[in-house]
């Protein structure tokens, strides 16, 4: 039997639902904390803040809480208490972004362990490549890197050491070719260019010292869907790093390739898939999805 108040989802999801929208779908109800796609039936809006990354806990509503929606003619005025002074770590300007390419994000190992808040781990899409870039320049494996799609061009403001890993792409220091997964000294005034990838999609740029970016829920990873983390990198941004680095550089690393090119010129890759969190919603035809070779 259908519970009272239950409504089916929209046959066509909306591409953008406004923040604060109150929606129901099936036996569930929710408030959209940020602008995001969604296919729930919308009842109205609320200005009650549902999320504050600086609060403990960040989510206003916790499992087991009872929530009542009340119709009002006018939303009350609220005082924003979410702003808190945050002391940014010391940073040294190292590189200026001359061209950010199609998309460049700050990424690290993400936000594991907060799935109960509805927050996905996010982080670098190719963690092996990100870790390799960091180790090559003497950073901790999980230090923040730049994750780039479509090429990037950087101008050194001071002498620094960088490493590029990931997809197969041409990397140049000025006009000199540079190998992937090799630490490279870039002197002040010189530029590093990474062309769009020819095999694969994402390249990773690590800078010795570790890139500094705004942290949210313990991570500087940019999650473009939820809006968590720093904004995407844009042309003109200045990339800063920690003032000290004690690790040794490593020029003996291999670039980890997630995608390989076969003799017929096609690329092949194996994608890891985890069903869930509501894997009980899948029917028997899920096996067709898992067993199909996609092209």
Task: Label each region the model flagged.
Residues 1-295:
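Conserved "landmark" site that anchors the functional core of diverse proteins
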